[in-house]
Amino acid sequence: MNSPLRRTRGDLIATGVIAGVSALLLGTAFFTAPARDAHLVAAEEEQEDYGQLAVVPKSFSEGFSLPDTSGRDQPLVASGMVITYNDNTLSATTPEGETVWTYERPNELCLVDQAWGKVVATYRDNAGCGDVVAIDAKTGKYAGTRSAIAPDKVVRLASNDRVGYASSERAEVWRSDLVRTVEYGHVEAKQEPDMQPNECTITSALTRTELVAVTEICDDGAFLRLQEATPEDSRKPE
């Protein structure tokens, strides 16, 4: 019968060093996390879903105005509330002009969209425009987060069923829990070879329900690619 192993002084020192390094790394990650400086003020109570007008009014008059520097080319409305961005702050405002929740964060805002009754904001960190937060539009409470390596310059890629981004290098979309369902184009750290058949220059991208469409320019010409929004493997387009 073998004698039991005994801990030596060297073992204890090694264990202490490993524990110390682990604690240092965890502490560094905590204190340097981009979301640490975020400040969310939720709604005092859940708001009603204001929905959409059933009949187009015969005339319009301005009820109120809000500054918006999000860079969007059209207003953003979620659950009937107007979502705006100004001075590093996202705000949700009712049709009566009352601001019911705000989300402030010092990081640069890359994109903001809405889907599934949530506001989805994408921020820049030290790994590109890949730090994402979802906020329930009616309550102003956190509804999900994700963080991944992403390009520095991205454009909107969203519908009522999917949200994501597109760039000249790659495109990806996420489902309601912010889990990625499609990854197309250049992959920074490939886990398996030959998963991406066309690493070309993407010129535009759209998504609707269960479809993702991408136009791109390759060495052998220009192409329109249609693929499923929920393939069997998110890393391999179908």
Where are these regions (language model features)?
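Short beta-strand elements that form the blades of beta-propeller/WD-repeat-like
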Residues: 73-85, 115-127, 132-133, 155-173, ...
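A charged, solvent-exposed segment within the mature domains of Sec-exported extracytoplasmic proteins
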Residues: 142-190
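Repeated scaffold domains used in trafficking and secretory/extracellular systems
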Residues: 63-77, 104-118, 148-161, 190-205, ...
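Well-ordered mid-protein domain cores that form the structural environment of catalytic cofactors
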Residues: 112, 130-147
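Acidic, serine/threonine- and glycine-rich low-complexity intrinsically disordered segments
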Residues: 183-238
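A short beta-strand motif characteristic of beta-propeller blades
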Residues: 54-68, 96-104, 141-147, 180-183, ...
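N-terminal "mature head" segments of proteins
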Residues: 2-116
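Hydrophobic/aromatic beta-strand positions that recur at structurally equivalent sites within the blades
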Residues: 93, 133-136, 173-176, 226-229
